């Protein structure tokens, strides 16, 4: 394991109405993070070098490399001058899934579909979420998104990171994760929820970004019934959420928002 700085104070020259002046600003760190399984690098992504164990677990789950945490028998975080290698040892069964869905990604910031070598992999079928009687109020949606923004400590300093949070009605946020990449932030959150053994079907995932199809895929893999976002969804994200029985809420502004799929889970209150 290794502790990595996630932000840095940078001195720079600023231009204001009064002219040029010396200034400083806290900016997020960015580093290449390699996901390696049984001695082979599977993916390399640019990410904020924090909450790396959560990141590795969440990525492994949402990529269907593992189906439960116990299939990762060991996890080591090794820092090099050029980046960080998260080295995982898998049980025997996940190795078959790994070879079937091998992908290599490099150079982009949390690119959710980078390096996938076929359309079938990019739009892989999802098992629809099970029907449940759980409902959430309009206040729950507003509170989930509002509390996420207030809990983003790194973004408060840098104004440069995405956030993802898991919210349970009546209890609040259980986990918040941040990253320069929106996909990375969600993977980190999914890893945190899995590590804590939280019941995903009891809560809402809130995100501070737009909703692309990859964000829907990750939410469905977690098993959460509602995904709520500050920004708008894509048409493909809406179609995917509809098919997967996920309630997709977007453009959340206090208690005003749009519900695109499976509206029955959201009630007035």
Swiss-Prot record:
Cell inner membrane as UniProt keyword: no
Domain of life: Bacteria
A cellular-component GO term for this protein: cytoplasm
Gene3D superfamilies: 3.10.20.10, Cytidine Deaminase, domain 2
GO BP of this protein: Mo-molybdopterin cofactor biosynthetic process
Compartment list: Cytoplasm
Keywords recorded for this protein, A-Z: Cytoplasm, Molybdenum cofactor biosynthesis
Cited InterPro entries: Cytidine_deaminase-like, FdhD
Residue intervals passing through the bilayer: none
Protein function: Required for formate dehydrogenase (FDH) activity. Acts as a sulfur carrier protein that transfers sulfur from IscS to the molybdenum cofactor prior to its insertion into FDH.
Family: Belongs to the FdhD family.
Protein name according to UniProt: Sulfur carrier protein FdhD
Organism: Brucella melitensis biotype 1 (strain ATCC 23456 / CCUG 17765 / NCTC 10094 / 16M)
High-level lineage: Bacteria, Pseudomonadati, Pseudomonadota, Alphaproteobacteria, Hyphomicrobiales
Gene name of the encoded protein: fdhD
């Amino acid at each position: 394991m290794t502790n990595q700085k996630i932000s840095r104070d940078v001195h720079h020259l600023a231009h204001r109405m009064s002219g040029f002046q010396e200034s400083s600003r806290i900016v997020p760190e960015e580093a290449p993070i390699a996901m390696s399984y049984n001695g082979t690098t599977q993916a390399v992504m640019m990410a904020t070098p924090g909450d790396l164990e959560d990141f590795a677990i969440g990525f492994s789950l949402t990529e269907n490399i593992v189906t439960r945490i116990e299939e990762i028998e060991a996890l080591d975080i090794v820092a090099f001058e050029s980046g960080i290698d998260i080295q995982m040892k898998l049980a025997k069964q996940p190795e078959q899934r790994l070879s079937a869905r091998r992908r290599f990604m490099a150079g982009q910031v949390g690119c959710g579909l980078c390096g996938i070598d076929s359309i079938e992999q990019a739009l892989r079928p999802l098992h629809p979420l099970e029907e449940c009687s759980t409902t959430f109020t309009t206040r729950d949606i507003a509170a989930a998104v509002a509390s996420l923004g207030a809990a983003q400590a790194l973004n408060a300093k840098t104004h440069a990171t995405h956030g993802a949070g898991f919210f349970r009605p009546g209890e609040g946020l259980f986990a918040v994760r941040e990253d320069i990449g929106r996909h990375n932030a969600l993977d980190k959150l999914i890893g945190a929820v899995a590590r804590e053994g939280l019941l995903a079907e009891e809560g809402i995932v809130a995100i501070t970004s737009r909703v692309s199809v990859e964000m829907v895929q990750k939410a469905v893999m977690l098993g959460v019934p509602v995904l709520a976002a500050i920004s708008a969804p894509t048409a493909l994200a809406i179609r995917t959420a509809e098919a997967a029985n996920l309630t997709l809420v977007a453009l959340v502004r206090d208690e005003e928002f749009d519900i695109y799929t499976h509206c029955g889970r959201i009630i007035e209150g």
